[in-house]
Swiss-Prot record:
It comes from Legionella pneumophila (strain Lens). This is Glutamate-1-semialdehyde 2,1-aminomutase. Keywords: Cytoplasm, Isomerase, Porphyrin biosynthesis, Pyridoxal phosphate. The gene is hemL. Disulfide bonds: none annotated. PROSITE patterns: AA_TRANSFER_CLASS_3. The modification N6-(pyridoxal phosphate)lysine is found at K265.
Length: 429
């Protein structure tokens, strides 16, 4: 028995399911999860001393790779001064100013501890500001695990095949309306049905928890217009896409300003973090300046602020995103070429340092159903065979993958060689 397997069995006796987040349990691919002990650059090492090229990157935060020296130095500099004070620090201001200077829609920002906190607070703020209760989300979009947002959600809920979750009363979700991603007509119909009741529309501008799906620009523009028409707020959940698809987020890339933006992952440089920001008059509705309450013991803690600030300073450097996008494109091209050589249909796409692929003969993937109809059995076989070759992809076909600045031509070539070997073996099996 491997040490990973031994640890997993031990973990199951004390931790529900043996993991502290469902997708880690490998339910989406079968088998037992790998336990890791260290990471450096583009690589992870497991507890059995096997090394892997890492395309998960802690689910997005590690855009600079594992243990980047600038991030380690920044954390070390504050570590010895105190890990948390429960009081304001100058680092909070510095990170807030840096984010606001880069994210087009943000004039004020509130730091929290996770993406879930950020989206939960954003919905509360939108309801308080508009004095309306209903909101629209999209089937398969995942916005964390707060009660009102766990309706037809993505991420681990898709892996487990659960459309919602027990433990949430109907009275909480009755104000949550859903539509299909990239379907503007459905959104318009909801606004027509509830013209005075919808506080906000929330979406991942580039979904990454129901597979990797690129938005139609007309869809995003249409959402902005509908929200303006019906006096509703538009929330971009950029926890995943913020500083991942481009220096100014998805909103900068597509030229569309939301009213509220939620952030996480990269702005903490690998530390637990979240944030929400937006127009000054909306953000001023948050306590203690306004009536909408939100609080957090560890919000703005020095370690996360230091790691996030160091990360943002690195990704600001000239050609950072040009190089990152080039590497990610090379990866998806390599996967596509390997599949084509094996005569196996595969769709792959990328944006910035974010990518996804699924085994389908479709020429485009536009919503959750397109991903769900792809070959999940083949994905599971491919995942495990690539893992055996030392390539670690997300253990679910519903999760996006991530490339860091530490991935280079060597890692792409190794991935291509492994994929070509694996896909040809699967084809002949």
């Amino acid at each position: 028995m491997s040490r990973s397997s031994d640890l997993f069995h031990k973990a199951q006796t004390i931790i529900p399911g043996g993991v502290n987040s469902p997708v880690r349990a490998f339910k989406g691919v079968g088998g037992e999860p790998v336990f890791f002990k260290s990471g450096k650059g583009a690589y992870l090492t497991d507890v059995d001393d096997k090394q892997y090229i890492d395309y998960v990157g802690s689910w997005g935060p590690l855009i600079l790779g594992h243990c980047h020296p600038k991030v380690i130095e920044a954390v070390d500099n504050v570590l010895h001064s105190g890990m948390s004070f429960g009081a304001p620090t100058e680092l909070e201001i510095q990170l807030a100013e840096k984010i606001a200077s880069l994210m087009p829609s943000i004039e004020k920002i509130r730091m929290v501890n996770s993406g879930t906190e950020a989206t939960m607070t954003a919905i509360r703020l939108a309801r308080g500001f508009t004095n309306k209760n209903k909101f629209i989300k999209f089937n398969g979009c995942y916005h964390g695990h707060s009660d009102s947002l766990l309706v037809k959600a993505g991420s681990g809920l898709l892996t487990l095949g659960i459309p919602s979750t027990p433990g949430i009363p109907q009275c909480i979700t009755e104000h949550t309306l859903t539509a299909d991603f990239n379907n503007l007509e459905q959104v318009a119909q909801l606004f027509e049905k509830y013209p005075n009741d919808i506080a906000t529309v929330i979406l991942e501008p580039v979904p990454g928890n129901m597979g990797f799906i690129l938005p139609k620009i007309e869809f995003l523009k249409g959402l902005r217009e509908l929200c303006d028409q019906y006096n509703a707020l538009l929330i971009f959940d950029e926890v995943m896409t913020g500083f991942r698809v481009g220096l100014h987020g998805a909103q900068g890339l597509f030229g569309i300003k939301p009213d509220i933006t939620t952030l996480g992952k990269i702005i903490g440089g690998g530390m637990p973090v979240g944030a929400l920001g937006g127009k000054r008059e909306i953000m001023s509705f948050l306590a203690p300046e306004g009536p909408v309450y939100q609080a957090g013991t560890l919000s703005g803690n020095p370690l996360a602020m230091a790691a996030g600030l160091a990360t943002l300073k690195e990704i600001e450097k000239i050609n950072f995103f040009e190089d990152l996008s080039s590497t990610t494109n090379k990866l998806t091209e390599a996967l596509s070429d390997a599949a084509e050589n094996a005569n196996i249909p595969l769709f792959a796409a990328s944006l910035g340092g974010m990518f996804g692929f699924c085994f389908t003969d479709k020429n485009s993937v536009e919503n959750y159903l397109d991903v769900a109809s792809s070959d999940e059995v083949l994905f599971k076989k491919f995942f495990h065979a690539m893992l055996a070759q030392g390539v670690y992809f997300a253990p679910s076909m519903y999760e996006a993958g991530f490339v860091s600045s530490m991935h280079g031509d060597l890692e792409i070539q190794k991935t291509y060689d492994a994929a070509e070997l694996v896909l040809n073996q699967l084809k002949s099996a």
